[in-house]
Amino acid sequence: MDPVLKDEIEKRRTFAIISHPDAGKTTLTEKLLLKGGAIHEAGEIKARKADRFAMSDWMTMEKERGISVTSSVMKFPYRGYELNLLDTPGHRDFSEDTYRVLTAADSVIMVLDNASGVEQQTEKLMEVCRMQDTPIITFVNKMDRHGLPPLDILEDIEDTLDLDTVPLSWPIGMGNRFRGTYNLYRDELHLFSHADMDGEHERLPIDDLDDPQLDEVLGDQADDLRFDVELVREAGDELDLQAYLGGKQTPVFFGSALSNFGVGDMFDTFVEIAPPPQPRPTVTRDVSPYEDDFTGVAFKIQANMDPKHHDRMAFVRVCSGKFEKGMEVIHHRTGQTMRLNNATTFMAQDREGVDTAYPGDIIGIMSHGRVKIGDSFSTAEPLHFTGVPSFAPEHFRKVRLDDPFRSKHLSKGLQQLSEEGTIQAFRPLRGNDYILGAVGELQFDVTLDRLEDEYNVDAHLTGVRYACCRWIDGPAEDLEDFEAENMDSLFRDAGGDLAYLALSDFRLERTMENWPRISFNSTKQHTAEEERS
């Protein structure tokens, strides 16, 4: 094995941050970038009102509304490691893009608000992590505000997410009595001060919790800390690296991202124990990152990162081997050879050319409509990486143009936005009006805004009676009969796949009973199959 390749792989950490909206994910992201030297000033949440936007929020609508609705990729060094941070949408209506991004991550940092504990979106995201046994470290945020008792938060994680918890730091008070944390992993006392916003908080090594220095520093809270630490150590589990790496146990840290407290404590441990790039599954076998041949998989398409050029960028995770500028790779769905001369790396919306990349790295290649989510690339063996599916939309609207002469622009815009997978556009087998499908209502607003902003298309949406969607498959003869009898309810999505839109759950159930040889699928895999011309 090439020792350089081995070294490059083992110092990489490719991870995502997940949270419920407003738990502090964007703030934590910026503090990590600050620690890695990737940025020199954190765009704090309050600064949005002063028109300074968060580093990872770059779309116009995100800037205006102060939410993250797309996923960004940020690469930065930290303590000799090479970090690839996949920043995911925090808004509840953008979970599907998050699902796909999680397939490109080897581990996850989960951010919880100490006042709320585990919330609904966190549960949904955990379903995807559980599918892949993704290792998770938990950061309980906003300890400088009043919230739930720490033991209640641990119990909530264990009961709701079915994860064993092992606290590696323990808070001393909360709200206006928050004095800091005790690092159970390194036996250090970290003292909190609102004045130390740069994260350089005082650390005191403590060999023995009976050390009188604790009483001098913490006063009456010293005995509370001793009691809590004794309880946690006697009743709780010890850190089990194999259980963590298998997605069964989550190390837990407490802190305040806004005050930059506890972030370094958590992140130092994260880079030490988080896994390097892992094998990636394909239809035929698992691909080891240590294999010599280059392989990669497209897990995301983003249209109009540069609105001036209406570009489409494919985000490709390097799965094995070494990427080199100008190398020729086979695009296995089409069978065509591509020369990758202009691959890029990312820092939110900023990109720069990349000469080399290793497993775990994310590179961007211009797709020009040729690359789809789930497409596989390699220099040799034809492989098809398995991907997280699209999920059947739960909300539907009909698109109406304000100017009918812009129909071609509408079609182009919906096609490109659909390729991102954030919105799903369905065109009826009979008729011309597009039906939009989304997993959350806010996606419709985003689609209208982006059509206007990026494609100069003014449109409005009207309600439709559809309640649910299923992708259709089955024997050719049965499909032909099914189409003939259900023409008014059948559509093609942007990928050309046949979908059945039902007026109610009851109607769907009846149709499924009447057509037992037809498959009605609530998900659609993005594993790309060959379509050679």
From Swiss-Prot:
Pfam short name (any one): EF-G_D2
Q: Which InterPro entries match?
A: EF-G-like_DII (IPR053905), EFG_III/V (IPR035647), G_TR_CS (IPR031157), P-loop_NTPase (IPR027417), PrfC (IPR004548), RF3_C (IPR032090), RF3_dom_3_sf (IPR038467), RF3_GTP-bd (IPR041732)
Which GO biological-process labels does this protein carry?
Answer: regulation of translational termination
Keyword Glycoprotein in the entry? The reply is no
Provide the alphabetized UniProt keywords: Cytoplasm, GTP-binding, Nucleotide-binding, Protein biosynthesis
* Sample GO molecular function, one term: translation release factor activity, codon specific
Provide the residue positions that the database annotates as binding GTP: 19-26, 87-91, 141-144
Describe the family membership recorded for this protein in Swiss-Prot or TrEMBL. Answer: Belongs to the TRAFAC class translation factor GTPase superfamily. Classic translation factor GTPase family. PrfC subfamily.
NCBIfam families per the record? prfC (TIGR00503), PRK00741.1 (NF001964), small_GTP (TIGR00231)
What protein name does the entry list?
Peptide chain release factor 3
- Source organism: Salinibacter ruber (strain DSM 13855 / M31)
- The gene from which this protein is expressed is prfC
